[in-house]
Amino acid sequence: MPKTAMTDSTSKTSTNTASSDMAAEFDSTTARLNASLSKPQLNADGHLRHFLGIEGLSRAQLLAIIHKAESFFDDKGQLINSPELEGCTVMNLFFEPSTRTRTTFEVAEKRLGANVLNIDIARSSTQKGESLRDTLWNLQAMTADIFVVRHSASGAAHFMATEVTPDIAIINGGDGWHAHPTQAMLDMLTIHREAPRPFEELTVAIIGDIKHSRVARSDIAALKILGVKEIRVIAPRTLLPKGIERYGVKVFENIDEGVVDCDVLMGLRIQNERIGSPLMAASNEYFKKYGITPERVAKAKPDALVMHPGPMNRGVEIASSVADGPQSVILKQVNNGIAVRMAVLSMAMQGQREYQALRSST
């Protein structure tokens, strides 16, 4: 894995110093990471044993995650419990702040019957200079079955997958600018369940800070694999990654043109913690130029969905009347996140069991 994306001292390295070019992704570092993802993710049967990123997976594999997630809803649309991880231990390692992702993972793990440990990174030995590798090796000695990791460095989850013993599954809860695969899959599940048309007939617009967003990268990859008719990205040029046109998306700097006839409008927040300095003079200036307002929603299809991965800044990326309006599925995304994370955890654990059975027989 590229050492520019992850080294043994990554736990002490901030995103801003990891690589001066990382914010200009889709760059060569991202390409190298994506190219190497599929091998460690899958067992010999092509089933997940880690979940590190969307790239390298097939349409059938993404649909399998969606269908598995749907199996955790009853006939009334309520989530059910399923003891598929009973006896397993899951450790949640969040080196970055998180509300929705960490909490929904924990709920998912408990609904599956797992023993759940939330590691307090702020009080861990990484604060005393311990490397990520040494932290990892010490935690795996405590006989965990699954690590769920979020880290500020691109490639952290991949690094962990190559460093842990083969019987531990790694789930990527978001790594730097690189990827947020479970967010992408809960977005795909939401579109699958709520959109009035199949993926192949949809036009999806992603609006906001594309340049620094791991969500945008993973969503674009998933939408392309699932065969969406058209993907649009809408942002000021300063918030667009170099070379994004090569990924088959249509680029708009004018939101009023970009949202016309869209089936899905997906807002993103400005990632100020990754930028280091504000790119807009004031939030009201950004809202005026790029906010998702009722007037802009009206330019999309009449039954268009409004989505946002959160955290959501009302009056900056989106109007409150839109976020709380009839076309918003934002809270459904959160609930779907539990089902998707249940699916990924269950599938990765099953894939690990198959992998271990094969190793034992050879």
UniProtKB/Swiss-Prot annotation:
Keywords: Pyrimidine biosynthesis, Transferase. It is an enzyme of class 2 (transferase). Pfam families: OTCace, OTCace_N. It comes from the Bacteria. One of its GO terms (cellular component) is cytosol. Residues 1-22 are annotated as: Disordered. The keyword Transferase applies. One of its GO terms (biological process) is amino acid metabolic process. GO terms for molecular function: amino acid binding; aspartate carbamoyltransferase activity. Its EC number is 2.1.3.2. Carbamoyl phosphate binds at residues 100-101, 150, 180, 183, 310-311. Pathway: Pyrimidine metabolism; UMP biosynthesis via de novo pathway; (S)-dihydroorotate from bicarbonate: step 2/3. InterPro entries: Asp/Orn_carbamoyltranf_P-bd (IPR006132), Asp/Orn_carbamoylTrfase (IPR006130), Asp/Orn_carbamoylTrfase_sf (IPR036901), Asp_carbamoyltransf (IPR002082), Asp_carbamoyltransf_Asp/Orn-bd (IPR006131). Signal peptide: none annotated. It catalyses: carbamoyl phosphate + L-aspartate = N-carbamoyl-L-aspartate + phosphate + H(+). L-aspartate binds at residues 128, 214, 269. Residues 7-20 have a biased composition (Low complexity). Belongs to the aspartate/ornithine carbamoyltransferase superfamily. ATCase family. Catalyzes the condensation of carbamoyl phosphate and aspartate to form carbamoyl aspartate and inorganic phosphate, the committed step in the de novo pyrimidine nucleotide biosynthesis pathway. PANTHER family: ASPARTATE CARBAMOYLTRANSFERASE, ORNITHINE CARBAMOYLTRANSFERASE, MITOCHONDRIAL. Heterododecamer (2C3:3R2) of six catalytic PyrB chains organized as two trimers (C3), and six regulatory PyrI chains organized as three dimers (R2). This is Aspartate carbamoyltransferase catalytic subunit. The gene is pyrB.
